[in-house]
Amino acid sequence: MFFAFAVLLIALATREAYGESQLNTKFILGSGNQVMFENINKEYNTHLKWDDDLAAKAMVEAVRPHYRLLWNTGDYFTIRNDKLFTKRYVGPLEEKVRLVLLNPFKKYADKLRQLPEGTTYGCNGFFDTDTMPNDNYLYVACVYNIPN
């Protein structure tokens, strides 16, 4: 319930920030996409556990900091990135997400591998398909909660 509310709140806040006619977002996390994020993270650490609430926090983190209308509270390790894709590029979603996360995951590979067992995480993101006429922006973030 909290997850659905958070996603709705982010969608409304983003629409308010950009104007309804200027932004058409397609949320990534949906049926089948949790598995995509799990597969990407398992390449670095097999002890991580998915958390829907952290996926909702990742939606907030996916937005660039200077555009955020909401802020996450808490002590989390976050990886985020965004990438511009031409509208002519019609590759599969998983390939695009991997391209967006490639450099930040390489940068934090050691930290990801050292996350202890019991660490929970969630990933999320969205497409901005209308702001630029010939390009789409893909925003993705993963949020990790390390147990005490």
UniProtKB/Swiss-Prot annotation:
GO terms for cellular component: extracellular region. It is found in: Secreted. Keywords: Secreted, Signal. Residues 1-19 form the signal peptide. The keyword Signal applies. It comes from the Eukaryota. This is 15 kDa excretory/secretory protein. To T.colubriformis 30 kDa antigenic glycoprotein.
